[in-house]
Amino acid sequence: MTNIRKSHPLIKIINHSFIDLPTPSNISAWWNFGSLLGVCLALQIITGLFLAMHYTADTTTAFSSVTHICRDVNYGWLIRYAHANGASMFFIFLYFHIGRGIYYGSYNFMETWNIGVILLFLVMATAFMGYVLPWGQMSFWGATVITNLLSAIPYIGPMLVEWIWGGFSVDKATLTRFFAFHFILPFIITAMVMIHLLFLHETGSNNPSGLNSDSDKIPFHPYYTIKDILGVLLMLLTLLSLILFSPDLLGDPDNYSPANPLNTPPHIKPEWYFLFAYAILRSIPNKLGGVLALAFSILILMLFPALHMSKQRSMLFRPVSQCLLWILVANLIILTWIGGQPVEYPFITIGQMASISYFCIILILMPTTSFMENKLLKW
């Protein structure tokens, strides 16, 4: 009799995706982040569902309903902080996952890569709308500032902003629709993840050497399932430490004050994982220019396959390119720091320099370096 996992129509798909999947034998811990992101997504959907059972999407009761979750619901504080800090873990892993893709040239799987960039946009939209829901000061003003950016679009901008708001300012209608979108988007993300995996399994995984690994593959289970479980345990250890010891470390104290349209906080800033893009937005004095730079700072990821000039796929044997990538990482850390600082000298200048160098490294220096490395190797 044929094994059920190889014959059953549904189990067969799972078998080909997670059990008998031929996987390169040399993939490192950098390949763990895909599964970690999957676990994060599941965790966010589960905790989010339990939060939605007690949350009310109304301007008069939203803030107090979150307080009620933390104080009166059994383990409500745990669910709330697991959801908030789970989002931070999600973005840490996302950035590692993208960084791995750039370092090892995984962006040459173009369909997988482009679906991944769309996924990044969807996750960013979901996180932004989720940040608005507790209806604290930073929720309200963050929503006002970020949605207002659309008014920079010529001709239709102001009309578009009022359409998103559902009125003449961020109010009850805005909160209700943001809750609806925040609830539905994770399921759309899950569907996109399946497409992401479908495209990945068409080509098979990349590996650190960047070479074809068809001659040396091993089954995903048990070798990589056990490796992924180790990653998940380390993630849960980190996440639980964060939740139980310093749950508000990555949050903003302003969000513990209820939203007040008459009182603007001294520094309006998004969550830490958006600060690099926020710094790029602020570093351009023109509103439309800033919005375009903000969009392009993420969209630039789609250009990586076109900017790949090297004859080698991976950066493993390209020390100069490696050096440039780590400079880019340092640059992004500087941008993240600047995004959280007030708009004054010297932060404005540092932000502008970091923004220019961000685009220069990706668009000019990395392709030029790859070209030079080819010449040095007489390729």
UniProtKB/Swiss-Prot annotation:
GO CC annotation: mitochondrial inner membrane; respiratory chain complex III
Any one GO MF annotation of this record: ubiquinol-cytochrome-c reductase activity
Positions bound to a ubiquinone: 201
Ligand binding (heme b b562): 83, 182
Cofactor remark from the record: Binds 2 heme b groups non-covalently.
Binding site for heme b b566: 97, 196
Compartments, record wording: Mitochondrion inner membrane
Transmembrane regions listed in the UniProt entry: 33-53, 77-98, 113-133, 178-198, 226-246, 288-308, 320-340, 347-367
Function summary: Component of the ubiquinol-cytochrome c reductase complex (complex III or cytochrome b-c1 complex) that is part of the mitochondrial respiratory chain. The b-c1 complex mediates electron transfer from ubiquinol to cytochrome c. Contributes to the generation of a proton gradient across the mitochondrial membrane that is then used for ATP synthesis.
Name of the protein in its database record: Cytochrome b
Name of the gene: MT-CYB
